[in-house]
Amino acid sequence: MRQRFVLDTTAITDAGLRIKEGYESLCESAAEVLDLIALARLKLDISCYIPYPSVYTELTSFLKRYGCDEEIFTKLDTWLVKKTPNRYEVKIPAAIFYEYIITVRQKMNRGRRLAEEYILESSAITAKLEDKSKIEEEIGALISKFRDKYRAVMRQGILDSAPDLDVLLLAKELEAGVVSSDAGIRKWSERLGLRFVEAAKFPRMLKEYLKLMGSKDIVGWFESEED
């Protein structure tokens, strides 16, 4: 059966992928991953999709911020299939929707309790300090700490953006695998019965497929990369 994969932004930009493969920069890792995707398309008929315009816009904006060459954007437009998920036809089981609502509700309650704790802590700080600049310094540090904890509580394990949801909808529509390093996407991919591939493992998986083909041009390409 022909293999298809739907990529989110982290499939190209994941920091863990760069460390694991030894890439020096985001632009270098993006170029190499896109080259692998191109070879997989030409030699193995493996297609990699990206939800359009949501994830595509997110990814291109990310690459532009890092000053990547125009060649990378050309590769992206050539080898990633841009497709908008059919949001009106893709069917999601009611049990999944029900579970998601419960998860969000639980996180809202945890976020509220966390906010209450920090409000009480800030009140204690202002009560014992008189110097305005010192109060601002202490409260500023407390707010920064609260933001980090609140983000961890609210975002971990849920779909917190439209692009995240588009990845799952498109994968469901195409019966494709999902490539990402996002914990929320992973969790709900598993709930939907979708194949999930860690972003950091995706390049090596493609290399293994290609090496088993035994084509001289493919083997030579890998040898030149290692040199």
UniProtKB/Swiss-Prot annotation:
InterPro entries: RNA_free_RNase_P. Disulfide bonds: none annotated. Keywords: Endonuclease, Hydrolase, Nuclease, tRNA processing. One of its GO terms (molecular function) is ribonuclease P activity. It is an enzyme of class 3 (hydrolase). It comes from the Archaea. The keyword DNA repair does not apply. Belongs to the HARP family. This is RNA-free ribonuclease P.
